[in-house]
Amino acid sequence: MSTTVDVPESSNVAKGKAIAVARPGGWKKGLAIMDFILRLGGIAASLGAAATMGTSDQTLPFFTQFFQFEASYDSFTTFQFFVITMALVAGYLVLSLPFSVVAIIRPHAPGPRLFLIILDTVFLTLATASGASAAAIVYLAHNGNQDSNWLAICNQFGDFCAQTSGAVVASFVAVVILVLLVIMSALALRRH
């Protein structure tokens, strides 16, 4: 007596059809790709802000050759802090690109995401602090302060003020990108 059991083939196997399997990654992979693209945009914004501020310089040609008025970013410690910080943010974003690629390849791995969200938050804080402090100085350069007898210098140093204002705007674009990166990393770390 034989103890074999005949199991008929299912209709899917007989017809050569496979069971549909959900694509691995899903929306987390889409977030990881968007993360990579935003990091590239953040590099451009922060590097542009640092380069624009670092090259802001204007000399007024009136008076004599030995006595001239000059406005430069290195005349203000706040602007020096701004240039250094935005260069650090750009450098961090460049160094974070491989971790972003790992998040694309392995979208369900929490390690790279956790690492990125912590460092993104640190550099978001630095970028916000430097952008806000530079914005305060640019505001004073444009409007002055009557109570402190600080005169507006943008009437005389128009090119310098235009460059510093553009650098501050670029820094706040980088800040918005970093905020989006933190939010996206937090969404990707959700368990649901």
Swiss-Prot record:
GO cellular component labels: plasma membrane
Topological domain spans for side Cytoplasmic: 1-30, 102-113, 188-192
- Please report the record's description of how this protein sits within the membrane: Multi-pass membrane protein
Q: Indicate yes or no for the key word Methyltransferase.
A: no
Q: Where in the cell is it found?
A: Cell membrane
**One Gene Ontology biological process:** cell wall organization
**Which regions span the lipid bilayer?**
31-51, 81-101, 114-134, 167-187
Major location category of this protein: membrane
Function, in words? Regulates membrane-cell wall junctions and localized cell wall deposition. Required for establishment of the Casparian strip membrane domain (CSD) and the subsequent formation of Casparian strips, a cell wall modification of the root endodermis that determines an apoplastic barrier between the intraorganismal apoplasm and the extraorganismal apoplasm and prevents lateral diffusion.
What is the protein's quaternary organization? Homodimer and heterodimers.
Member of which family?
Answer: Belongs to the Casparian strip membrane proteins (CASP) family.
Protein's recorded name: Casparian strip membrane protein 1
